[in-house]
Design a protein with these regions (language model features):
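Conserved nucleotide-binding/hydrolysis modules and their immediate coupling elements
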Residues: 1-83
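Divalent metal-coordination and catalytic microenvironments
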Residues: 43, 105-107, 131, 201, ...
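Glycine-rich, acidic loop segments that terminate in or are immediately followed by a histidine
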Residues: 198-210, 233, 304-408
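A conserved active-site cap/scaffold subdomain adjacent to cofactor or substrate pockets
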Residues: 204, 208, 216-263
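Hydrophobic helix-and-loop "lid/oligomerization" segment in the mid-to-C-terminal part
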Residues: 248-340, 349
Length: 408
């Protein structure tokens, strides 16, 4: 049985210990110790990592998990049973996890006390934490929740833990949450004058250690809300990143940080106006270009053929332009536009032409080395840019004219 020193002092980061067993594992070796400061993966909190040092060497502990009767330390190299070691955890990692977890207790208590929202899920990753509440909260309630939790943290309330011998011993405690299926001893973490909750993880000694609590996101989740939060140094890093981003924007717009939102909105409005003007101008240019294309239509049998290279026309504008280029008489339109890397093409015909555009597109694909398809009156495709494109286009134009003349 391993003595769990982290339950006695959450700020203890090293201890002397003896290796009880060492067995090969899939990714190294699994060690058990007679006592440890390493917290395992449990209670929604990630495990500690660190080092085991001994005369003549050291091994890295990459993780720790709980089994039925022991804590298993995952090490990169073996340490013989009976070896005396000094176990040391990554203090920064542990303190970060304690800040987030104690902050989660505080946020969950405030949500329950103020809005009756029950925490039904908690997850802590290396980048953020999430709390799942069983009812939705609006923007004003979220601000109130964040403010209340920060005010309690600033009061530097004591955080204590106590173990109870049975479920019956918990009667009378103001428990916010009681995890199911717990076996004795049952550990309860209490924040002075606030939260009381069963929990197996190490926590901050006082709420002042949490630092700032910041809600970064809130999304609807199973009829409730999933909150994403940051505490302590994570919140500081987030605030610094956001401040620096706003600072860069302020310099970009040559304005003060407090005016960035207005400057961005002004640019967005100007961009929207410019896009509207561009669309209007583009429509006029397309109409003019379509008129030129219709004027250049050539008779081929009973129909007219409009075939042209229209470089500079965007791919998304090619089909609308082809539709505008249709004449009053039966017409087949073949347009091709090339940029630096790709050739886009479209085949479009009016009713009565008597040809299937999907079939003709296969001939274009073969001639240009492209891919595309369609059926009936419309087909389109694309191909890599290649030498001799103008010659290939001229040959395709002749082929289409020949097909039109042969159509009945």
């Amino acid at each position: 049985m391993t003595r769990r020193l982290y339950l006695e002092d959450s700020h203890l980061t090293r201890c002397r210990a003896r290796v009880l067993s060492c067995t090969p594992a899939q990714a190294g070796y699994d060690l058990t110790l007679d006592q440890t400061v390493f917290f395992p993966n449990a209670g929604g909190q990630p495990c500690d990592t660190g080092t085991l040092r001994f005369p003549g060497g050291a091994v890295t502990v990459t993780g720790c998990d709980e089994t039925d009767d022991a804590l298993v330390h995952h090490a990169d190299r073996p340490v013989p049973a009976g070896t005396d070691v000094e176990a040391e955890i990554d203090r920064a990692r542990r303190f970060d996890h304690m800040q987030q977890h104690t902050g989660e207790h505080l946020l969950s208590w405030c949500a329950f006390q103020r809005f009756g929202a029950v925490n039904v899920g908690f997850h802590l990753s290396e980048a953020y934490g999430t709390i799942d509440l069983d009812r939705p909260l609006d923007a004003a309630q979220l601000q109130e929740l964040e403010q209340a939790a920060n005010e309690l943290a600033a009061r530097d309330l004591a955080v204590t833990a106590a173990s109870y011998a049975s479920e019956a011993a918990l009667e009378g405690l103001p428990l916010r949450k009681h995890a199911e299926g717990l076996t004795a001893p049952i550990r309860v973490v209490t924040i002075e004058g606030a939260d009381c909750c069963t929990c197996c993880a190490p926590h901050c000694a006082r709420t002042g250690e949490i630092g700032m609590l910041f809600l970064t996101d809130a999304v609807a989740w199973k009829g409730g809300v999933r909150l994403t939060f940051l505490c302590g140094l994570r919140a500081l890093r987030h605030a610094r990143a956001m401040h620096d981003a706003v600072d860069r924007l302020a310099r970009r717009f040559s304005t003060g940080r407090e005016n960035v939102e207005a400057a961005v909105q002004k640019q967005a409005d100007e961009l929207s106006a410019a896009r509207r003007a561009e669309r209007a101008l583009g429509a006029r240019v397309s109409a003019y270009l379509a008129q030129e294309l219709r004027a250049g239509a050539e008779r081929a049998g009973r129909a007219l053929l409009v075939a042209a290279q229209v470089d500079g026309v965007e791919a998304k504008a090619l089909r609308p332009l082809a539709q505008q280029a249709l004449c009053n008489a039966p017409t087949l339109v073949f347009l091709l536009a090339a940029d630096e890397s790709r050739v886009q093409y479209v085949l479009l015909c009016s009713d009565g032409v008597g040809l299937d555009m999907g079939e003709l597109c296969q001939a274009v694909n073969a001639a240009l080395g492209g891919k595309g398809g369609g059926r009936g009156t419309m087909a389109q495709g694309s191909a890599p840019v290649r030498d001799g494109l103008s010659e290939a286009f001229a040959q395709l134009k002749g082929y289409l004219a020949q097909r039109l003349r042969a159509a009945r």
